[in-house]
Amino acid sequence: MLKWMAALMGLLSSSFAGLTFAQAGADDLAGRWAVTWSNTSRNAMSLANKSGRFSGTYQNDDKDSCSVTGNFLASNQHLALQIVCPKWDIRMQGTASKDSKTIRGSYQAYVDGVGKFVMTKQ
């Protein structure tokens, strides 16, 4: 009985430690980023995190400030973002690196514009 209780406590401790790590992963993604698109243009983005949901700003090529919203799934380090600018929007899907310093993925802009992106933590 004592061994069973010790095993159960160890399992519960591991589970809660994983939850703490998952939240820290989302928190690590908050901050300033540089987004490099497949056409090699580079733009600034800032993200704030609240419980795995992101909000922020993106500066487009015309220097307009655009809104950013999104979410983070800790189990697979997957991030989904949407940038909304005055004349267009972009949907991004990517995966954060283990050290939370880069995010790589793909995007869809307009109706049929697609490509790859890399985000680098500043």
Task: For every predicted segment, state its role.
Residues M9-L11, T20:
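Cleavable N-terminal signal peptides
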